[in-house]
């Protein structure tokens, strides 16, 4: 994977999100797979029309965009990237639980749960 592709990635990860990714990867469940990255992708569905999905993945395709941000690596496929361009991924902990959140400048509307959006 070229450094140009890695450096051109248009999504940022907050320190809180990066810390959580590193914590998850170093947990006992993934101790033998330290090459994991946070894959962020978009699926149709949810009350807003599109949903954000997050998984830990050790696979990177040639057409994936990859960035290292605050010590964690994020991977996004080209289709999802068009919807996430310029976004910021954060990690939130509150009374109702904890989750990754996306601040997406492309979203015209976001549902109250924050997990789905429309364009």
Curated annotation (Swiss-Prot):
UniProt record similarity statement: Belongs to the HesB/IscA family.
PROSITE patterns, per database record: HESB (PS01152)
Protein name: Iron-sulfur cluster insertion protein ErpA
Any Pfam family the entry gives: Fe-S_biosyn
Assembly behavior: Homodimer.
Alphabetical keyword list: Iron, Iron-sulfur, Metal-binding
Function: Required for insertion of 4Fe-4S clusters for at least IspG.
Binding of iron-sulfur cluster, residues: 47, 111, 113
Cofactor(s) essential for the protein: iron-sulfur cluster
Species of the source: Blochmanniella floridana
GO biological process, any: iron-sulfur cluster assembly
Gene Ontology MF term list: 2 iron, 2 sulfur cluster binding; 4 iron, 4 sulfur cluster binding; iron ion binding
């Amino acid at each position: 994977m070229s450094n140009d592709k890695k450096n051109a990635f248009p999504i940022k990860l907050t320190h809180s999100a990066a810390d959580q990714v590193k914590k998850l990867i170093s947990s006992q469940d993934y101790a033998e797979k330290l090459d994991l990255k946070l894959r962020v992708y978009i699926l149709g569905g949810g009350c807003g029309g599109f949903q954000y999905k997050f998984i830990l993945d050790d696979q990177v395709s040639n057409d994936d965009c990859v960035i290292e941000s605050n010590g964690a690596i994020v991977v996004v496929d080209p289709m999802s990237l068009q919807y996430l361009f310029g976004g910021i991924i954060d990690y939130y902990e509150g009374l109702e639980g904890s989750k990754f959140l996306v601040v997406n400048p492309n979203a015209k509307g976001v549902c109250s749960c924050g997990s789905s959006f429309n364009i």
